[in-house]
């Protein structure tokens, strides 16, 4: 066939066909999501033990950047011992995620009872997610987007497989890849992963680590910026950061009071309603208010 005789590809969606249903909101109204995610080096079992008692909502054992090459095998063995411990696997135990270095880590740890999830560094394509999901069936996955290419593929990665439970940025590598010096230069990428996560019916992304463990004021300011962009919670690299992160992401007393007023009003009058101060409230506003109360532990 000549070029103009070549048939056009089929339209992706018949305009007359009904639109597919919107995905369900992955944030239950009555469940408080984790806010603090503490990274610890996998070759330091004593540090991991302290992290499990630090009050962090999730502990992430790092087998990648935090472990020197000649310590990788030891770190994997120590992590396997931890994840095989019945105490780690108990229903009320702190969830333990593992940021893997490679496929050897995945194969060695995937079936251990104390593993809550894998965090997959430097993911750039959905095919990588499919591969890990195939060799570690049933394990929740959290791809980390750390390059310009990953940001371009954010939605395809987020929606790659039902094993994906969330996505997040790896900002140190991303900053280097993009040549960004000022923190605000990453806001586009942050917003991109927030939109990709929500479009894929995933929870809001967790903010990347704040590297200066002494600058708690700077951490607070950075968390406020992340919250404004739609992120929820933050990874930490030191226990002293946990309290600041939690306070930054928990609703204020005023926000809780406002949410209680909205939820109470919605219980009396179904559907769209107007508050005494004249503001219009619909189902989306009520759902947001319920999430606020869940965060505050008031649901």
Task: Describe each PLM feature range.
Residues 2-299:
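Expand to "…catalyze enediolate/carbanion chemistry for C-C bond making/breaking, isomerization
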């Amino acid at each position: 066939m000549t070029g103009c005789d070549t048939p056009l590809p089929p339209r992706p969606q018949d305009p007359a066909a009904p639109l597919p249903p919107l995905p369900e909101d992955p944030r239950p109204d009555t469940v408080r999501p984790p806010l603090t995610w503490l990274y610890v080096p996998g070759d330091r079992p004593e540090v991991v033990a302290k992290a499990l008692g630090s009050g962090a909502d999730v502990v992430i054992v790092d087998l990648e950047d935090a472990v020197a090459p000649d310590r990788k095998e030891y770190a994997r063995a120590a992590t396997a011992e931890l994840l095989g411990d019945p105490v780690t696997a108990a229903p009320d135990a702190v969830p333990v995620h593992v940021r893997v270095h490679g496929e050897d880590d995945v194969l060695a740890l995937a079936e251990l009872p104390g593993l809550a999830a894998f965090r997959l560094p430097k993911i750039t394509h959905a095919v990588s997610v499919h591969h890990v999901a195939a060799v570690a069936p049933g394990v929740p996955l959290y791809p980390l987007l750390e390059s310009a290419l990953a940001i371009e593929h954010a939605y395809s990665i987020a929606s790659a497989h039902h094993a994906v439970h969330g996505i997040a940025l790896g900002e140190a590598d991303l900053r280097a890849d993009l040549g960004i010096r000022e923190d605000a230069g990453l806001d586009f990428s942050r917003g991109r992963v927030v939109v990709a996560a929500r479009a894929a019916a995933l929870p809001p992304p967790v903010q990347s680590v704040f590297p200066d463990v002494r600058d708690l004021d700077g951490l607070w300011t950075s968390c406020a910026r992340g919250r404004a962009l739609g992120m929820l919670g933050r990874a930490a690299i030191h226990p002293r950061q946990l309290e600041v992160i939690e306070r930054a992401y928990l609703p204020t007393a005023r926000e809780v009071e406002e949410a209680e007023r909205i939820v109470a009003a919605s219980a009396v009058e179904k559907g769209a309603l107007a508050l005494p101060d004249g503001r219009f409230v619909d189902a989306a506003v009520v759902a947001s208010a319920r999430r606020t109360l869940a965060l505050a532990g008031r649901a």
